[in-house]
Regions:
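Short acidic-hydrophobic surface loop/beta-edge motif
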Residues: 6, 18, 107-114
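Conserved phosphate-coordination/catalytic loops
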Residues: 22-26, 50, 160-163
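Active-site HxH/HxHxD metal-binding segment of metal-dependent hydrolases
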Residues: 27, 32-109
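Residue-level marker for buried hydrophobic side chains located in beta-strands
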Residues: 21-23, 44, 68, 139-140, ...
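A structural micro-motif
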Residues: 1, 38, 63-66, 115-117, ...
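Metallo-beta-lactamase
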Residues: 116-187
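Conserved beta-strand hairpin/beta-sheet module of binuclear metal-dependent hydrolase folds
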Residues: 1-36, 131-145
């Protein structure tokens, strides 16, 4: 599984592309360019904060059959610019309305188009956070960023849960020898 990291401009968030899937959805033009005419099957969302979702509507306009995989709380946050914090940067304000695309995932193992996906609920940075284990990779969003401290000052943050889940993800990654793909990139 080859993974391409798309470095988004907004808050240096990261979007990952592999085998017709995305993890998070930032700069739509960069994403569409990286797909280079290939099919987009689905988008896994780690949480609903603006810097991880702001390209969603434009990408789904280009790929209307792609599914959006997320937690129930992320789904609720996609529809509310206060919950997804997009009201903070008005030019990226976002309220999602395309519910036919959304597949709510609970913690556990799922088979999606023949691909095994382990979903881990990791609230803390935000109450809706999920991490995804696919093959020997773990996509941690903002729940575990090896080179940065977790930000826990949002309205739905929980500092103690954030640190607990960060330690849990670090342990899972180390014990299972998983390569970590966090929700932000560094220069």
């Amino acid at each position: 599984m080859e993974i391409t990291c798309i470095q988004n401009e907004l808050l240096q968030s990261a979007t990952y592309l592999f085998d017709g899937y995305l993890v998070d959805c930032g700069d739509s033009a960069k994403i569409i360019n990286a797909l280079d005419g290939k099919e987009l099957k689905g988008i896994f969302l780690t949480h609903c904060h603006q810097d991880h979702i702001y390209g969603l509507e434009k990408v789904l306009t280009q790929f209307p059959h792609a599914k959006v995989y997320c937690s129930q709380k992320t789904w609720e946050g996609l529809k509310d610019d206060k919950l997804n914090l997009s009201y903070i940067i008005p030019e990226h304000s976002f309220c999602f309305r395309q519910d036919k695309n959304v597949v709510v995932l609970n913690e556990g193992c799922h088979t999606i188009d023949g691909m095994e996906v382990e979903v881990i609920s990791t609230p803390g940075h935000s109450e809706d956070c999920l991490s995804f284990v696919i093959n020997d990779k773990i996509f941690t969003g903002d729940s575990y960023i090896p080179f940065a401290k977790i930000f826990t000052k949002w309205p739905t943050s929980n500092k103690s849960l954030a640190f607990e889940n960060e330690a849990r993800l670090k342990e899972i990654a180390e014990n299972r020898n998983l390569k970590v793909f966090p929700g932000h990139w560094t220069r």
